[in-house]
């Protein structure tokens, strides 16, 4: 039995890590992919997890398999393909740790997962299925993702969705919006970044955009909206909460911050979904998730940099003492 299974991309983040003596950019190969980042944090929170996806039968694919397995995630749903290479994402960061992406994915193994390769037995043994839109950018992997979602729905699972919009990977932003709409329409848990929310709703004013979202997707029991250094907010039933981010950390790379946050919210929902909660409890969820997300930005390579619960609580306590 798994608490959370995720389907989607597993890839190599080629993260900029300085300059050589002759002025050439140096890139560091780190394991990445939003779904597995989410699972890695859930493992730290004591959850049992499994992954469904595809990598190339190459040095990167084998490295990823070993790393994901060593993080505690079951890889019974991981498929190797000898005909296509593992996807690479080159990541440049600015002075704030924010990122620009260049993807080598034409095609990449993650987008070639077929629906007949989806391990439905793993899904049926899970409580939650988590997914994003990178596994819906192309027809082959979209069919696999839809099969996973339909299997999850038929088996009574909760669905968790993070759009994780990457415009360079879409041939049409209209199609991207359609897939975000689909993901939101089938899920009980949605974590969305503020610019993604504006893109989906067509509304720049945050409160109005949330109102539009909640009207369009009454199925979403827990909605969280992240805004980077501006903090986050959450909506659960008729309760609203917000919390600032933790700025007293030395940010190196924001890769995986949203995934870390998302994992903490999934964990909270597994404990509290369906219960009556107070605003303070919802805010505590955000504080914990914000702290975890802040800590993961202090290192490169999110999947291998997920914080321990003790470190998260220590940061929260340190912040309270400084207020």
Predicted stretch roles:
Residues 10, 134, 163, 260:
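Active-site metal-binding loops of divalent metal-dependent hydrolases
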């Amino acid at each position: 039995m798994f608490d959370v299974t995720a389907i989607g991309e597993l890839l190599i983040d080629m993260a900029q890590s300085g300059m050589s003596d002759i002025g050439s950019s140096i890139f560091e190969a780190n394991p990445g992919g939003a779904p597995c980042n989410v699972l890695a944090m859930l493992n730290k929170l004591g959850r049992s997890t499994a992954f469904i996806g595809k990598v190339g039968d190459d040095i990167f694919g084998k490295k990823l398999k070993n790393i994901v397995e060593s993080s505690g995630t079951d890889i019974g749903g991981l498929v190797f393909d000898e005909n296509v290479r593992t996807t690479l994402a080159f990541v440049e960061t600015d002075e704030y740790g924010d990122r620009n992406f260049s993807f080598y994915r034409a095609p990449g193994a993650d987008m070639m997962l077929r629906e007949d390769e989806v391990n439905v037995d793993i899904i049926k043994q899970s409580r939650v299925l988590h997914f994003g839109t990178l596994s819906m950018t192309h027809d082959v992997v979209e069919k696999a993702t839809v099969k996973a979602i339909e299997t999850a729905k038929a088996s009574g699972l909760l669905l968790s969705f993070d759009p994780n919009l990457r415009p360079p990977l879409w041939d049409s932003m209209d199609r991207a919006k359609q897939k975000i709409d689909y993901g939101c329409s089938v899920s009980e848990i949605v974590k969305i970044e503020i610019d993604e929310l504006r893109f989906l709703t067509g509304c720049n004013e945050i409160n109005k955009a949330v109102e539009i979202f909640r009207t369009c997707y009454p199925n979403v029991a827990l909605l969280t909206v992240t805004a980077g250094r501006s903090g986050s907010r959450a909506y659960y039933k008729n309760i609203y909460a917000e919390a600032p981010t933790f700025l007293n950390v030395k940010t190196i790379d924001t890769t995986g911050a949203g995934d870390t946050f998302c994992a903490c919210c999934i964990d909270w929902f597994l404990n509290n979904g369906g219960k009556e909660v107070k605003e303070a409890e919802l805010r505590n969820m955000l504080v914990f998730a914000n702290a975890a997300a802040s800590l993961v930005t202090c290192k490169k390579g999110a999947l291998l940099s997920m914080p321990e619960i003790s470190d998260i609580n220590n940061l929260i306590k340190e912040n309270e003492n400084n207020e």
